[in-house]
Amino acid sequence: MKKEIKKNYRIGIIAALQQEVQILFNKLKNYKINKISNITFYIGNIHNIHVVLAKSGVGKVFSGITCALLLQKYKVKFIINIGSAGSLNKNLKPGSIIIPTNVCYHDVNLTAFGYSIGQIKNCPKTFLSNTLMLKLTEKYLFENKIKYQKKLMISGDIFIDTCEKKSLLKKRFPKAIAVDMEAAAIAHVCYQFNIPILIIKSISDSSDINAADNFKYFINLASKNSSLVTINVLQTLFKNTKNILFDNNNRC
């Protein structure tokens, strides 16, 4: 007998680009496609897990809107952000996996009012990934001998493509290992709505003068690696959904 899909446990998965959602889309069964304000949502199931896969578009505003729609319209129980990121760490090469423990904005500065660089008023210095979800993902990566790093990742509406920009970020955020354009905004929305988040990214470039060319060359590799880890982690996460929902450390 076919196992029933438990639709009460919808998982929202967000990526910015078509390349970043394509592999998961190819795995979707019994899917339908919706478009809201030029944001594409793919509703279906992967390995009998009910998911809403969203292609947000690039940047903080698009990704934030997408996350809010997933939470309000599609009533997802938790969010996974996947896709590519630029490296700020010499040990992270194209294709490397990162699962950030926390994220913040690199293009926010309210230090004149006593806040830390990257901190929004009435919010913490960084937004945290869900502890249990991180542990389950780490367990999968460790058991399958997949190398990864997990520290701070920073986000902003800037593609980092010079050594000067990279050096400035490393100076301002010495603990950051990678940079993208969406994760902090998605985590911010999850934080406001008290929804847990997991971020699974793969490196596409080194955030330097060759970043644009390397991004074009390695985006498919980064998308593939991020997606394959996500697909394999989904089943583990689903088994622990109830625990995850009660282990939320993402509240303002």
From Swiss-Prot:
GO terms for cellular component: cytosol. It catalyses: S-adenosyl-L-homocysteine + H2O = S-(5-deoxy-D-ribos-5-yl)-L-homocysteine + adenine; S-methyl-5'-thioadenosine + H2O = 5-(methylsulfanyl)-D-ribose + adenine; 5'-deoxyadenosine + H2O = 5-deoxy-D-ribose + adenine. Keywords: Amino-acid biosynthesis, Hydrolase, Methionine biosynthesis. The active site is at E20, D205. Substrate binds at G86, I160, M181, E182. Its EC number is 3.2.2.9. GO terms for molecular function: adenosylhomocysteine nucleosidase activity; methylthioadenosine nucleosidase activity. One of its GO terms (biological process) is L-methionine salvage from S-adenosylmethionine. InterPro entries: MTA_SAH_Nsdase (IPR010049), Nucleoside_phosphorylase_d (IPR000845), Nucleoside_phosphorylase_sf (IPR035994). Pathway: Amino-acid biosynthesis; L-methionine biosynthesis via salvage pathway; S-methyl-5-thio-alpha-D-ribose 1-phosphate from S-methyl-5'-thioadenosine (hydrolase route): step 1/2. The keyword Hydrolase applies. CDD domains: MTAN. Homodimer. Belongs to the PNP/UDP phosphorylase family. MtnN subfamily. Catalyzes the irreversible cleavage of the glycosidic bond in both 5'-methylthioadenosine (MTA) and S-adenosylhomocysteine (SAH/AdoHcy) to adenine and the corresponding thioribose, 5'-methylthioribose and S-ribosylhomocysteine, respectively. Also cleaves 5'-deoxyadenosine, a toxic by-product of radical S-adenosylmethionine (SAM) enzymes, into 5-deoxyribose and adenine. Thus, is required for in vivo function of the radical SAM enzymes biotin synthase and lipoic acid synthase, that are inhibited by 5'-deoxyadenosine accumulation. This is 5'-methylthioadenosine/S-adenosylhomocysteine nucleosidase. It comes from Buchnera aphidicola subsp. Baizongia pistaciae (strain Bp).
